[in-house]
Amino acid sequence: MNKKLKVAIIGPGNIGTDLMIKIMRHGEHLEMGAMVGIDPQSDGLARAQRMGVATTHEGVEGLTRLPVFADIDIVFDATSAGAHVRNDAFLRSLKPNIRMVDLTPAAIGPYCIPVVNGAAHDEALNVNMVTCGGQATIPMVAAVSRVAKVHYGEIIASISSKSAGPGTRANIDEFTETTSKAIEAVGGAAKGKAIIILNPAEPPLIMRDTVYCLSELVDEDEIAASVAQMAADVQKYVPGYRLKQKVQFDIIPASRPINIPGVGQRMSGLKTSVFLEVEGAAHYLPAYAGNLDIMTSAAKTTAERMAARILSAA
């Protein structure tokens, strides 16, 4: 099967440009059709043009006026949560069955973490890629929850300030809300919480993530094995994803329960701590921007699976 589906990317910033380069270099069932922006002076649009990709600086309206629009099957949206709602409604009014891969926290469609629930959404018209922190940490919550009932999952995503563009900064609140909900909906925790830290250190540090899960008491070796397997599965599409150290365990006895702010319960059980780092592939972005690389890699993986399904049905 060497036929490919044409895709458009809305948002020629860091994420959009990195995604474009990944598709052009490594697209299996995908090929670039158009890059869409709103700033005629955009570096990303200029780069796309130099690489032979059709461009428009007139937003999604401009996309629909491009000759290639008739052949576009999948659209990646790397703008902002508010813009995605409008973009989806506008494009769907013209092409009801167009596939949208949402890299914003808008979450119109189901949350998609490829390694956890990607196969369940091959047919979805709109999928949400949660957030960079969600893509890195929710697999670990899911790894614990497939072994034990998780009462509470908390993630802390620390990213280089330099890797956080205007889109990331404009969506901080949406980041925490969307990630928290996805920890529950996809990760399987009864209650989830997400924290993001923009680290201004120079030279920039690569993405680091901490995952805490409070679960029922089970065999610690089972959880450690599940976490290791999940990390290996994520590495298939994000090679720079790795455990920073061994999984840590603490038993919290019922005689000395803890209170978790926001949950408000006296809780006991097994506390699992997972420490991760994510190094980017440096296709376009620097290696320290693992937070952006994991989003573009997850989005491409999801779209490749969608495209394979569409092509096999054709």
From Swiss-Prot:
It comes from Dechloromonas aromatica (strain RCB). Keywords: Aromatic hydrocarbons catabolism, NAD, Oxidoreductase. One of its GO terms (biological process) is catabolic process. The keyword Translocase does not apply. This is Acetaldehyde dehydrogenase 3. One of its GO terms (molecular function) is NAD binding. CDD domains: ALDH_C. Gene3D superfamilies: Dihydrodipicolinate Reductase, domain 2 (3.30.360.10), NAD(P)-binding Rossmann-like Domain (3.40.50.720). Its EC number is 1.2.1.10. The keyword Transferase does not apply. The active site is at C132 (acyl-thioester intermediate). Pfam families: AcetDehyd-dimer. NAD(+) binds at S163, A164, G165, P166, G167, T168, R169, A170, N171, N291. It comes from the Bacteria. It is an enzyme of class 1 (oxidoreductase). It catalyses: acetaldehyde + NAD(+) + CoA = acetyl-CoA + NADH + H(+). HAMAP family: Ac_ald_DH_ac. Belongs to the acetaldehyde dehydrogenase family.
